[in-house]
């Protein structure tokens, strides 16, 4: 959902550029990038939290993401074209008109993200708002049963400052 938001926001940010602009072309060629950096993961964990596998088990789609990714890319390209078309049809003149149009496009983006969320929830399951987790010792005996939200589980069991406690080391030979 975060990557979808980045793509759609990129479309809004490039709304006035021509369709054959290199940046616009790149966005439509790469609506969902594969992978990412450690900081992206740490940001997601900090924002949303985490759940144990027992609270949200794997699905067919989570183990086979290519079909889901293809569907999401098609949907995002369609939505990106709809945003660009809405801007082109309105053809706002002046800064105030453009700012008003951006607000309309951002409102459309929120509706589009709801569709993306629905696709993700159908493929991966609805993330639990709250769950009960049973902790067992090495003998399999129950030690505790607690209720958590994804963020409270993250705070209790990860409790690392992933944003400030680590640095990212990277080698990118193509930049040399």
What are these regions (language model features)?
Residues 1-176:
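Structured alpha-helical subdomains that flank or immediately precede key functional sites
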């Amino acid at each position: 959902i975060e990557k979808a938001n980045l793509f759609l926001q990129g479309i809004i940010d490039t709304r006035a550029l021509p369709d054959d602009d290199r940046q616009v072309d790149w966005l439509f060629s790469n609506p969902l990038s594969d992978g990412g950096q450690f900081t992206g993961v740490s940001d997601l964990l900090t924002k949303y939290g985490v759940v144990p596998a027992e609270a949200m088990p794997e699905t067919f789609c989570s183990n086979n993401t290519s079909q889901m990714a293809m569907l999401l890319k098609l949907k995002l390209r369609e939505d990106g074209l709809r945003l660009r078309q809405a801007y082109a049809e309105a053809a706002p003149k002046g800064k105030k008109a453009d700012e008003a149009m951006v607000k309309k496009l951002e409102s459309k983006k929120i509706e589009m993200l709801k569709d993306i969320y629905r696709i993700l929830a159908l493929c991966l399951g609805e993330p639990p708002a709250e769950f009960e987790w049973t902790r067992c010792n090495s003998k399999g005996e129950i030690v505790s049963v607690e209720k958590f939200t994804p963020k409270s589980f993250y705070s209790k069991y990860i409790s690392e400052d992933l944003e400030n406690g680590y640095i990212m080391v990277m080698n990118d030979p193509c930049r040399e």
